[in-house]
């Protein structure tokens, strides 16, 4: 059994069952004929972004939102350290090596507020379509690079 098939089965089980913890998930995997080590299951849960949430006093394992844009937005948001502006442009500081991805994400949004982006290693220069829109553009960037 490969990793993809195993993780697909985990997603299927979580969509069809109310699972409170990894032990219960491991048992459901075994019941379906999949033999998985606890350490492997733990890694799979981390890679899939599975969280435990308390609902009505009970815990339930949940998959993250399946909307790819929302997932990417959250990932890109984690890479951003700060967003600062002056009268003419906006500078986004990122984790080292992440500026290109953040710049590409902003370019993909095709906002009329953004004339263009230039990315280095850890800095993105965002050039507004008009200097009159700096405040609106900064808010737009915060909204589109947030984790929520």
Curated annotation (Swiss-Prot):
Family the entry assigns: Belongs to the ArgR family.
InterPro entries (alphabetical): Arg_repress, Arg_repress_C, Arg_repress_C_sf, Arg_repress_DNA-bd, WH-like_DNA-bd_sf, WH_DNA-bd_sf
Entry protein name: Arginine repressor
Location of this chain's protein in the cell: Cytoplasm
Keywords assigned: Amino-acid biosynthesis, Arginine biosynthesis, Cytoplasm, DNA-binding, Repressor, Transcription, Transcription regulation
GO molecular function terms noted in the UniProt entry: arginine binding; DNA binding; DNA-binding transcription factor activity
GO cellular component: cytoplasm
Principal location: cytoplasm
GO biological process: L-arginine biosynthetic process; protein complex oligomerization; regulation of arginine biosynthetic process
Stated role: Regulates arginine biosynthesis genes.
Gene3D superfamilies: 3.30.1360.40, Winged helix-like DNA-binding domain superfamily/Winged helix DNA-binding domain
Keyword flag Transcription regulation: yes
Pathway(s) of this molecule: Amino-acid biosynthesis; L-arginine biosynthesis [regulation]
């Amino acid at each position: 059994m490969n990793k993809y098939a195993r993780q697909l089965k985990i997603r299927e089980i979580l969509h069809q069952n109310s699972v409170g913890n990894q032990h219960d998930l491991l048992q459901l995997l075994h019941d379906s004929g999949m033999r998985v080590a606890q350490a492997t299951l733990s890694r799979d849960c981390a890679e899939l972004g599975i969280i435990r949430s308390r609902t009505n006093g009970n815990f339930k394992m949940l998959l993250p939102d399946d909307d790819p844009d929302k997932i990417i937005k959250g990932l890109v948001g984690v890479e951003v350290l700060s967003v600062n502006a002056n009268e003419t442009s906006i500078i986004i500081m990122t984790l080292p090596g992440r500026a290109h991805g953040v710049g590409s994400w902003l370019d993909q949004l095709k906002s009329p507020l953004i004339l263009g982006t230039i990315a280095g290693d850890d800095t993105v220069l965002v050039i507004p379509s008009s200097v009159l829109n700096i405040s609106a553009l900064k808010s737009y960037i915060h909204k589109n690079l947030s984790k929520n």
